[in-house]
């Protein structure tokens, strides 16, 4: 827990003035973890838009979906355009997606990813959702690999080591790490201690631990000491850059 007088002990300024500035050094061929569950709620929409405008190419994106907001629509405010990683696919910036739910629940409403995948413009690594979360967590914890029974005997286990433990078969899954994580949070203090809200609680807290650089957009930034320590979801050590959303 930090008091307001502790700012002198932490001189590094993590606060950026714009989303464009915060993502400006993301190069081609980067691997990114991008938050969100399905719709745009809890998703770092402003950082994704800034990355689209930056134009970095040949990106590998690790996310729960490959972009469903434009076809599902739930969670999008009236009059707002749905934003998720689908806009990066449309802009031909992604070469590979590692995800659990890459396609639309409705065949009549294909996503940008589905259209690109059908044209062989983007690669897909399909990962069961629980396995995806654990692979990301393992990356942040320094665990190189683990065995899980999920997916044994299916396409997701093809080419992977299978071992038997106590009479049951398990598949070896490797950890996931990223160069950058783009994250949405509700609140941050000036040091980067985060509080999540709603669907931003899902993958965000593990993604920030598994990325070399974590970039966070927040609804509000408060002074040091204004967030009670017991309420902190992600401690400052995992946060590198913070941008406050000026308009909601």
Positions of PLM-derived features:
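Conserved alpha/beta enzyme-core scaffold
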Residues: 10-248
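Short, Lys/Arg-enriched N-terminal segments with co-localized hydrophobic residues
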Residues: 1-11
């Amino acid at each position: 827990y930090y008091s307001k007088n502790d700012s002198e002990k932490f001189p590094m300024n993590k606060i950026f003035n714009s989303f464009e500035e915060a993502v400006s050094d993301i190069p081609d061929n980067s691997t990114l973890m991008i938050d969100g569950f399905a719709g745009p709620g809890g998703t770092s929409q402003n950082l994704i838009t800034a990355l689209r405008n930056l134009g970095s190419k040949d990106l590998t994106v690790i996310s729960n979906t490959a972009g469903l907001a434009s076809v599902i629509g739930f969670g999008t405010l009236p009059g707002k355009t749905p934003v998720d990683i689908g806009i990066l696919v449309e802009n031909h910036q992604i070469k590979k997606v590692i995800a659990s739910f890459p396609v639309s629940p409705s065949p009549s409403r294909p996503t940008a990813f589905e259209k690109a995948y059908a044209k062989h413009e983007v690669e897909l690594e399909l990962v069961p959702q629980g396995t995806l979360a654990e692979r990301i967590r393992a990356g942040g914890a320094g665990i190189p690999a683990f065995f899980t029974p999920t997916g044994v005997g299916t396409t997701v286990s093809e080419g992977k080591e299978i071992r038997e433990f106590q009479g049951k078969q398990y598949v070896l899954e490797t950890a996931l790490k990223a160069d950058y994580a783009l994250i949405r949070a509700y609140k941050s203090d000036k040091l980067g201690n985060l509080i999540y809200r709603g669907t931003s609680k899902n993958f965000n807290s593990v993604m920030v631990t598994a990325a070399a650089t974590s970039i966070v957009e927040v609804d509000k930034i408060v002074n040091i000491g204004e967030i009670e320590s017991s309420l902190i979801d992600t401690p400052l050590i995992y946060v590198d850059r913070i941008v406050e959303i000026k308009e909601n």
